[in-house]
Amino acid sequence: CINWIKTLEIFEKDYTFDKEFKTKIFKSLKQQCDVLLEVYDDFRILSNWGVLQNCGLITFAFYYHLTDTDYFSIPLKRLKHQCAIQILPDGVHWEQSPMYQNEVLNCILEVAINFKKHKFSIPPFLKRTISKIGYSNMAMKKPSHTQPMQGDSDYTDLRDIITRCAAILKDGTLKSAGYSEIDFESIWELDEESIKNYPSIPTNYPKYPSMALEESGNFFLRNSFHEDGNYLWFSCGTIGSGHGHANLLHFDLNYQGEDFLIDSGRYTYVEENPVRVELKNCYAHNTTIVDNEMFSKFKCAWGIVEAALPLNNYYKFNKNFDYVEGAHLGYLNLPNPVIPMRKIFYLKPELWIIVDQFNTSGEHKYTQFFNLDDKITPTIENNSIILQGKNTLFMKWSDKLDICIKDIQISKEYNNLQSSKRITTNFLNSGATTIMTVISPKDFKIEKIEVRRGNNDLVNENEAKAIKISLDNDEIIFFNSTKEINNQ
């Protein structure tokens, strides 16, 4: 409905359709809308499909001046309900896929624009929803202006849709994440008043660059909002729907506007294509697994066989450092259960310490995955990796690990594959285990140091571990404990 009506509106600026043709289109669209009004079930209440369906009905009602009929009142009521239950308090769509979140936002913006064009007041729930999703887009936007390829998402520029949010709401903070002027795409979407007023909206940058979207479990650690800024996205939230992937404890890393560590994308929805499940699995994300077992499992294109339960996240952001941690219960079913936990300490502007902690009492094999952007070349040097792109990053570990590099495929755009690399590390250990990974653009030295009690007794690494990082002329001591500190 929406595309038909938008096409008609464009042509009607310079062309008059004959009555017979217009009647034919109306009958066809009405027949479709009658079905959309009648077919509405639990799936559509929760799915992005339902939002698209109701927005099409509302657009139909506006164009044909049917706002006093069920074609308008029923879908508007349904849409209000959908916005309340599909959009989390932090502005993220519950299906955990930015691509589909923004399909929903596109349609909601279309409805709001129709309200303006037809001199109706935009309902408050629409403004709230546009604001919530717009701000979550601003939080997730990389220095390259693209969304992370979370779930079933492509490498898509977010500036145009954020620009439309800013224009409709007259929001200067959202404008800072969009274009300074209305872009070509948005000219076709917005009403004339919003386009005219956009230059007068003052641009306001957020006070703090790092942002926590707590309800969805998405955290964004930054040193600035500039194109040459540093960015880390950490994910530890619900899997969402069939669009969700096994990305618990995953992180993206972008240094000076260049992608280094990424989500591998989606590629296809074809049931029998093995790449579909391959890109949904744990190893296509920068996370950890235990004993070669996947913490979440999938079947065919849409089936979720098992989904690990995420635990509550904790974060602390300030001007000097950012910290975030998360965990999940995906390995409680092992004969000897394990609780994986990841802690990320970002010492601004350009040092990242990744702590992978595994609480258990038995012996297990622990594996880390690091999936690289297709423009990054990795090289193994002793117990470290050099990542080479336009910039260079050094990755080093506190322990001697088995490190290998594998050829993989990633997908930045639907139906397209790119060749890339995956770094895999393996570590066999008994009891509570901590693996520390340090990443910096400057070469550095890392060494384990002893942890002792007040009586000078040595503390076992199963209980606590510390490292010393020598960087430039500085020494950084980093400590992690797997047990509660007591008076022993």
Where do the PLM segments sit?
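Aromatic-lined, polymer-binding surfaces characteristic
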Residues: 1-131, 141
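Short, conserved secondary-structure transition motifs
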Residues: 35, 102, 131-144, 381, ...
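Carbohydrate-active enzyme catalytic cores, enriched for enzymes
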Residues: 58, 99-261, 429-430, 434, ...
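Secondary-structure boundary elements
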Residues: 66-70, 81, 117, 121, ...
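Pocket-edge structural micro-motifs
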Residues: 222-223, 235-238, 264, 292, ...
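Short helix/loop capping segments that flank catalytic or ligand/cofactor-binding pockets
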Residues: 229-232, 242-244, 261-263, 270-272, ...
